A protein has these predicted regions:
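Short amphipathic C-terminal alpha-helix that caps PH/PH-like domains
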Residues: 97-109
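Catalytic beta-strand/loop cores that center a nucleophilic Ser/Cys/Thr
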Residues: 1-96, 113-130
């Protein structure tokens, strides 16, 4: 339809999720998300169970309309896993929004509220981890 390759058109942030309890956000990306998402990697999730809803969901172009995510949680191999596909190392001392998101995630995964409900096969995780 367009003269350029299809691309994503934004993110849907599930701000009501407890992972964001200590990170101010709306249901869409605001200014604080620029630094966080600048070097993020999108995970193709169309083969995952329908019930798995990424807490940071990438909105694909209408040409493709695939399920994409940057952050999600699941049960894998009897354990609990939270995946966040963003750069968490580069110049972190200069990135207050990223630090605050990581602090919120850390508090969440250490709490009793971290209880993923959807089971994923380990092969899915291996498909995007190098």
């Amino acid at each position: 339809m367009f003269a350029w390759a299809p691309m994503t058109i934004g993110c849907l942030i599930h701000a009501d999720e407890p992972v964001f309890a200590d990170f101010p956000t709306s249901y869409h990306t605001d200014w604080q998300w620029w630094d966080i998402l600048e070097n993020a990697k999108v995970i193709e999730m169309q083969e995952t169970p329908r019930e798995l809803r990424p807490f940071i969901q990438v909105i694909d172009s209408f040409d493709n309309n695939e399920k994409l995510g940057i952050g999600f949680e699941a049960r894998v191999g009897g354990g609990r896993l939270l995946v966040l596909a963003v750069d968490t190392r580069k110049k972190l001392d200069e990135r207050p929004a990223t630090r605050q998101l990581l602090e919120s995630i850390d508090k969440y995964v250490r709490s009793d509220r971290f209880d993923p409900q959807v089971e994923l096969d380990e092969s899915f995780i291996r498909s995007f981890v190098r």
